Amino acid sequence: MISIKKFKKIFKIIAITIILVFLGYVGVYLYAKSLDKLPITSANSFYMYDNKKNLFEGTNDEWISIDKISPYLINATISIEDKKFYKHHGFDFLRIMKAMFTNVMNGKNLQGASTISQQYAKNLFLDFEKSWKRKIDEAFLTMRLETHYNKEEILEGYLNTINYGGIFGIENASNYYFGKSAKDLSLAEASILAGIPKSPTNYSPISNYDKAKERQKIILESMVKNKYITENEMKEAYNTELTFIGSKSEKKSSILMYYQDAVLKELETINSIPTSFLKTGGLKIYTNLDTNAQKLLEDRIKENIDSENELQISAVL
């Protein structure tokens, strides 16, 4: 049980922080408004090569306008990532205060409060460094986006560049996972895809189906709470059996997908480069993968293991 003295101290810290944040917000807003627009064109691709320097993975920039994206996907994303997106000017101060209080009370960083605008600014222009300078840069860039672009433009850019499990942009992701355009996504499909950006490796429906379904349930419940769908629609979507084209695609095997995710994860954890930044960097990534031997290995597995068998086999050369 927290003491009254400690509670007053925490309250004082939060109150002072709120005042400073507000004053800083006004100053940044006025300065950002006086500057020119930031360029928010489609980001560069990343390219991944095998041990013989042959390209086996590269993202294509399929930028689509917001009116060509399923309303289910848009509403699912807003519900789970930033439910006040259309109401705030780049920052959700109530959410920030709640996150600060939770983190101070627990003594660790348990809860984030980034809006879609903040995430987009971070993904486009910043690296993975964790510092106060980076936080200030993020706030400033967010304000520049908000002062020069409308909500539809920001959301369109965000959805066209975000990481969906190694597939960047909603049109690429929709085609990869379901073999269809983003405008044709059903509620069940959209709620699965909207859950991936939070943690692309953990919530990929191909590599972590159970976790992806847990995330989907949270998103659907959030959509009901925000009155985007009914409870019956939620239940129907959750119980819909989905077929993921990506896991059976001739273009990219599921094992290669795991390999790509592992490489991106290593770059993120060991080299401090986030997967989202890889999209904007236009990086060329050279690996030790032997694609010929890998294909031979996978063919042998397919010949000897029934696709319906519950036995799970994975190997990378």
For each predicted feature, which ranges?
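Juxtamembrane regions of bacterial inner-membrane/periplasmic proteins
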Residues: I2-E308, S314
